[in-house]
């Protein structure tokens, strides 16, 4: 998303843009997402939820998102208010329609090519390194298959500084699923379950966060990056559970009633990356946007699409000055 946003905004400002996409289609992981672009309603809540994140970047995203959403709708794609979470506010877009609108505004996308040959001004926006992180830790991938971190490597080679983190945004999944099921198949009901590992230890007895991202990372730390959700009879009646159980791939009945469901940690995007300022500038002639920019959500969870949208705009605007 961030690369398309940056290209669209740069063209709007009169710049000539070369847009390179490593994959065989535009849209990156945005196309596989729920399409909700959101922020916390209150900035202090943002800080409470993501206490280890870069505060100036957090404030930039929080302050600019609403006008950025208006800009996005100005491209001809309609969003609907997203109000189901009392902590957050945002808009939901159809991912396919959003991708199409951004591609039309961004111009020609050269597919199958990850970077230009020349060393001119460059905006890097490649979706972080979820594939690399998942492969190194034996976890499932819940992102596009191309985000391996080469964009971050390129920015670092051109003088950028690293913003390291081993955190990620992910979900508990029932096992490998087709990418079109990444959202629907997420086993997002761990707060109603007893969470145990393969030797029966309850590894996460604490209260689970609203996003369950903390639980996904705790599952990743278990042997094999997997765990069991043990659900009692009452939990099985909850609509949040009933909607997700059809996607379960391995279940076992519990003695005395109930069910346990096998889950695996899956990585959507990483939190580490390149250090940027509030103009998305990483080095002389290099801007980094989206989740290639590290350090925004550390210690919690915030919208990766909001980060992509705001930093994509900031990168284009600064690069075009």
Functional labels for PLM-detected ranges:
Residues 20, 119-129, 286-288, 312:
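Short hydrophobic core segments
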Residues 284-321:
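Catalytic phosphate/nucleotide-handling subdomain of diverse soluble enzymes
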Residues 247-299:
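A glycine-rich dinucleotide-binding beta-alpha-beta segment and adjacent secondary-structure elements
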Residues 90-117, 150-158:
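Helical element adjacent to the flavin cofactor pocket in flavoenzyme catalytic cores
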Residues 22-107, 194-209, 243:
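Conserved N-terminal/central alpha/beta ligand/cofactor-binding core
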Residues 1-19, 315-316, 320:
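N-terminal Rossmann-like FAD-binding beta1-loop-alpha1 element of flavoenzymes
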Residues 158-252:
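An anion/pyrophosphate-binding glycine-rich loop and adjacent beta-alpha core
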